[in-house]
Structure formats: C-alpha cells, structure tokens
C-alpha cells in the first residue's frame, strides 16, 4: 500500500504529516513552513491557496477564510463572481494543494489520507469533510477526532498506562477529550466541546476593542470598511500572538481611514492584562465542556495523569493558567500544539497501511443518535460517548390504526424534544399491511462506522420489507455533485499546471534573450559577421515570437536560438583555447537548462 498521509484540516491553519520509518514527520509546504493557512483566494481566474492567498487578503474581497466553521451547513455558499462554491469545494482546494506538495515531497502519487475533525463535529460535518477529501482526489481512509490524534502523537512508544485529558482549542473549534492509554490501546472515554469557539473569537475581541476606541476618538466606524477590517484582522491576530510572549504590544495601522482633516492613523497599546479582560468569558466558556468530559468519563481531575494542550490558541497564557488551575497540574508541553494532530493522523495512516503495529484506536460518537417518536419526542438509540464502530436496534410500532407507512426522522443531539436537535435525514418505510395501532413491529437499526458516519435502517418484522439510508448529511452532496466537483478540481489543477509551464517558458525566453544579447555584445570584436548572423537571426525570431505572445512559436524559436548559441560557443572556445570561450558558453546554455537555472537567477536580490 502507498503512503497514507495524515491531514489536520484546520479552521485557521492546516498541516500534513507522513510516517517515515517508525516516526511521523511534518511535510513542509512550498514556502518551507510547517503549517499552511486555510485560506483560498480567487484572482484573475486563478485560485490561490495558503500563504499567497493570506498575503493578498487585504486587497482581494474574493478571499475565503475559516470555511471550516461552515462545514455541514446545507444552505451555505460562497459567491465568487457568477459562481457559487460549497464549503466542501473550498476545503477541497486546500486539500488538493496539500496533496500536491505532499506528492512533490514524497516523489510519488498520494491517493490515501486520514483527515482529522473536531471531536464534537456532528454527522453532517464529518460527511462534509469526507466529501471534501473525495473532491480533492483523496481516498479518505479514516476520519478521526483531533484530540484522539494528538493523544496518538503523545502516546506513541510509551508503555505506561495513563489517563489523559486533551484540551484542544484551535482557530475555530474547541474540544475536550478524556482517553485511557495503555498497551497500545488508545480508548476515548468521553468527549465534549463547542464547534464555534476558537482563536478567531479572541481575534474578534481585539478587533471590537480597536473599532470602538477608534470610533470614540475619530467618529469613524471602521467596521463599515472591508479593507480596514482585513487590516484590523491581521493586526489583531498578530497582537494576540505577541501577547503570548510579551506583556504589552503596540498596534500601528497608518492611513486606516480618512476624515475631513485628512488621513487617519490607528495607534494603540494593548497589554496582556487588557487582552485577558476582553477575553475572560471565552476562556471561562471552555470550563463547562472540561467538566462535562470528566463527568461523562466517570472521573475527577485527580484521576488524570497527564493534560495535553492542543491547538495554537492554547499558547494564550490565560488559557494555560486556567487549564492548570482546573486540572491541578502543569499541562504537558512535549509536543507542538500546531503539529500534534497531523502527526497523530500520520500514525493512524501508518496503522492503516500496516507500517505501525500494536496500536488500537477506540473512538466515540460525540452526540446521541435516535429518532423522533410520537409527540415530537427524541428517542435515543445510541448514547453519546459510545465506542465506535457500533450498532443498536430497537422495536417501534405504528401510532394509528391501519397506518400504511412510517416516517423515520433521524436525529443527533442531547435535547429531549426532536425540534431542538439536529436533523440528519428522513426516510419512509411504506406498504405496512393494515393492522391496529401498536401491532406492527418496526425494527430501527443504527449503525455507526469507524469514521463516525451513520447508517440507519427500518424493517417491518411482519413482512420482512426493509428500507435503509446512509446519512449523507444535511449538506446533501450527491455522488453526481461530488463527481462534478472532482472534475472541476482536476480542471483547476490542469489549468495551474499549464499556467506554471507558461510562466517557466516566459522566464526561460527572457533569460535566453538576455544572455545571448550579452554574449553577442561581449564578443563583438572576436566573431565574423557570418558567425554572428545565425545567432542574430534566431534571436530576432525569438524576440518577435515573444512580442506576438505566441507560445508555440516561443518554444520553437527558443530551442532554435539555444542550438545556434551553443554552436557559437563552440566556435569561441576553439578560437580562444577554451578559457574565454567557456565564459561565453555559460550564458546561452543557461537558458537551455530549464526552470532550475532561471529560478536561481530570479531569486537574487539586487539590493544585497
């Protein structure tokens, strides 16, 4: 089996790792960074992803951030020009980019992946994540919970039995999971969380504070200015990160707006104490899931051997202080909170490929599952924190005499009334023979696979007739839609490849024209007109093709000039005994070497 990569598809940043030997290793992106911003931008018909998309976000309104917050939302679409994209498609662009640079690193095709999700993601959100992987051309071997993945990274090669609490505060989601580790078994005992709480919310508090102060001082509301808001967002994120290391930071945004008297500048000093005051309720909001996870596991803080912090937002000092107080012990800092999830996903990939032995992962379903019964009551069949995969059946009956069909309304949640819980899907079991109310026996079976994806069936025990559905999530992508999106993604990949080849060709042509012109100028007195003419003619032909913007002609004339220049270099070498000619040879041949030489030339900083 080929390598199975592990992907942490994050709200703010994503990361990817692979098992090398027996150890997981982070794969760096083309910029050399170990995490990639989960940002997608559309500009001039081109799709930009990661660092480059984030850098131009201020000036480009068609930039999408934090799309993970909308995974599984049926009606959410991103409009770009006259086209609409689902959260799955935007996420697929990120996954496709990760897939590509992983393939470049490994030197082989990547088809299989383990993708992580917040432990508290519901079925719709999990299915949407799996669909995103499929659109990106990945066979998603497993969806695993982020805290579980970080526990895998922490617990690899550790033999002792431990109860571990994972506090996972990312860019947009929050989870707490309690696990039992021992003898290679990673068993999740409980999980709790909030899928709409994370580092973005901390950034927003700083932004709100800056907007209010600026309005009080200048009478201008920056929240109405899209470009100003993007600058504020970047500044708030930077200030938050700065305050993890220093007690005060200065925020400076010149020319943020304009008033009657001219340009307006934003200058502010934010102390860590003020930041803690602005965000204290957000930190406190994580206490309830913390307590509930312990309660559901049947444990107290005294039973916990280790506390692991996961997610970049756990670098916030107030968060670390709170967790230490609640847990009664110092959290473990042995693994990088930005990388642990991807590393754990890579380990699970190794388990799937057979490269890692003696590890068993026992995860749980985060929310209860059941159906709506008479009176709008939510009747649970599978309780939250049940180890998966699992299956559960229960017998129900009709609510009226001679009822010909039953509507199976599948739900997920913890509220007693169906209207307050999350609808996963509906289906109907028909052709029930006439019978008094309560006589027909309808067996409803819930089956949850290892990815947490739900299958539900209903069977009339009298006739043997059965109806079943795989919950495709309320985001509702059909196989046809996924195939169409896959095709779109592949076309974009082909377009990107063509665009890259075109840029490389133009760079090679520019370089070859420059070096050939220089060679002809430097050897003006050493060559006869008859020797120079083939090169001059080929050079003019290439310049014309470049001016006409004819790519086919440019390629043909580039090859012709390269050959003519090489012939000229040989003559120079013969005339001058080698040394001087060799210098002339280097230029024209440089243009014939493809992208590597050109890349090196273009990276030189003329100011250094």
Curated annotation (Swiss-Prot):
Induction: By stress conditions e.g. heat shock. The keyword NADP does not apply. Residues 577-608 are annotated as: Disordered. Residues 577-586 have a biased composition (Low complexity). Residues 587-597 have a biased composition (Gly residues). One of its GO terms (molecular function) is ATP-dependent protein folding chaperone. Residues 599-608 have a biased composition (Basic and acidic residues). Pfam families: HSP70 (PF00012). Keywords: ATP-binding, Chaperone, Nucleotide-binding, Phosphoprotein, Stress response. CDD domains: ASKHA_NBD_HSP70_DnaK-like. The keyword Chaperone applies. InterPro entries: ATPase_NBD, Chaperone_DnaK, Heat_shock_70_CS, HSP70_C_sf, HSP70_peptide-bd_sf, Hsp_70_fam. Transmembrane segments: none annotated. The modification Phosphothreonine is found at residue 173. Acts as a chaperone. Belongs to the heat shock protein 70 family. NCBIfam families: PRK00290.1 (NF001413), prok_dnaK (TIGR02350). This is Chaperone protein DnaK.
């Amino acid at each position: 089996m080929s390598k199975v990569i592990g992907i942490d598809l994050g709200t703010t940043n994503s990361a990817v790792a692979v098992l090398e030997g027996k150890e997981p290793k982070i794969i760096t992106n083309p910029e050399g960074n170990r995490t990639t911003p989960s940002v997608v931008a559309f500009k001039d018909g081109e799709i930009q992803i990661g660092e480059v998309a984030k850098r131009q976000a201020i000036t480009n309104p068609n930039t999408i951030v934090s799309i993970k917050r909308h995974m599984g939302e049926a009606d959410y679409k991103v409009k770009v020009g006259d086209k609409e994209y689902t959260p799955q498609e935007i996420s697929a662009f990120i996954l496709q980019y990760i897939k590509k640079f992983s393939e470049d690193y490994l030197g082989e095709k990547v088809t299989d992946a383990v993708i992580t999700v917040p432990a508290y993601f519901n079925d719709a959100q999990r299915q949407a994540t799996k669909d995103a992987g499929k659109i990106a051309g990945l066979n998603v071997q497993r969806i695993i919970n982020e805290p579980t993945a970080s526990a895998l990274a922490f617990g690899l090669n550790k033999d002792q039995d431990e109860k571990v609490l994972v506090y996972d505060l990312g860019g947009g989601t929050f989870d707490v999971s309690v696990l039992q580790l021992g003898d290679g078994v990673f068993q999740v005992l409980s999980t709790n969380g909030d899928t709409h709480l994370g580092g973005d919310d901390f950034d927003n508090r700083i932004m709100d504070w800056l907007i209010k102060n600026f309005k009080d001082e200048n009478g201008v509301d920056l929240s109405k200015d899209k470009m100003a808001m993007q600058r504020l967002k970047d500044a708030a994120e930077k200030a938050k990160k700065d305050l993890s290391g220093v007690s005060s930071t200065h925020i400076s945004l010149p020319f943020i707006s304009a008033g009657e008297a001219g340009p307006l500048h934003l200058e502010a000093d934010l102390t860590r104490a003020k930041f803690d005051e602005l965000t204290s309720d957000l930190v406190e909001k994580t206490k309830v899931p913390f307590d509930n996870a312990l309660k559901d596991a049947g444990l107290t803080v005294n039973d916990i051997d280790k506390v692991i912090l996961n997610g970049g937002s756990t670098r916030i000092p107030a968060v670390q202080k709170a967790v230490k107080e609640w847990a009664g012990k110092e959290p473990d800092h042995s693994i990088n909170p930005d990388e642990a999830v991807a590393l754990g996903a890579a380990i699970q990939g190794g388990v799937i490929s057979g490269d890692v032995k003696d590890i068993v992962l026992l995860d749980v379903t985060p929310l209860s599952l059941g159906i709506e019964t008479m009176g709008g009551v939510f009747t649970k069949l599978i309780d939250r924190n049940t180890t998966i995969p699992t299956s559960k059946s229960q017998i129900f009956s009709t609510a009226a005499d001679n009822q010909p069909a039953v509507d199976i309304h599948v739900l997920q949640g913890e509220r007693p009334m169906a209207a307050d819980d999350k609808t996963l899907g509906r289906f109907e079991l028909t052709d029930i023979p006439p019978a008094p109310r309560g006589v027909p026996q309808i067996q409803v079976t819930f089956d949850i696979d290892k990815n947490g994806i739900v299958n539900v069936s209903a069977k009339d025990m009298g006739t043997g007739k059965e109806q079943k559905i795989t919950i495709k999530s309320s985001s509702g992508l059909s196989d046809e839609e996924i195939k169409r999106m896959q095709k779109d993604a592949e076309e974009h990949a082909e377009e990107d490849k063509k665009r890259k080849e075109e840029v490389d060709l133009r760079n090679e042509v520019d370089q070859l024209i420059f070096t050939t012109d220089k060679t002809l100028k430097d050897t003006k007195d050493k060559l006869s007109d008859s020797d120079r003419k083939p090169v001059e003619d080929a050079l003019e032909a290439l310049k014309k093709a470049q001016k006409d913007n004819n790519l086919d002609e440019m390629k043909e004339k580039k090859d012709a000039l390269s050959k003519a220049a090489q012939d000229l270099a040989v003559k120079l070498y013969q005339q001058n005994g080698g040394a001087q000619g060799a210098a002339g040879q280097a230029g024209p041949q440089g243009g014939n070497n493809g992208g590597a030489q050109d890349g090196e030339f273009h990276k030189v900083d003329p100011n250094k």
